[in-house]
């Protein structure tokens, strides 16, 4: 999209003045949603290609518009996931290490180990 208007981004913009944990949770939710949507898109892509290469499909398919739209959706969700992972890592470094709400088992949110 040429313009992004998103309630989550408004929350992220104001995160420093608000509840950082709530923002973290909202980003996690968005990441999980994008991951599920990406999986659906990838299954659809596999069905469309039906064993053919992308090059062969685009050269021979009757319609290419739906495929081109699909690969834009795939790219969009991949970018959403990358951004969410980065944002979650930054937030994890900023929150206190004794944060009772942290996900100790979530390797995506754990910073580097320290001795000391």
Language-model segment annotations:
Residues 1-43:
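Amphipathic alpha-helical dimerization/coiled-coil segments
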Residues 7, 69-72:
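Amphipathic alpha-helical interaction segments
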Residues 24, 31, 38, 45, ...:
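Heptad-repeat amphipathic alpha-helical coiled-coil interaction surface used
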Residues 44-68:
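Acidic interhelical loop/turn segments
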Residues 85-106:
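Long amphipathic alpha-helical coiled-coil segments
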Residues 108-116:
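Long, low-complexity, intrinsically disordered segments
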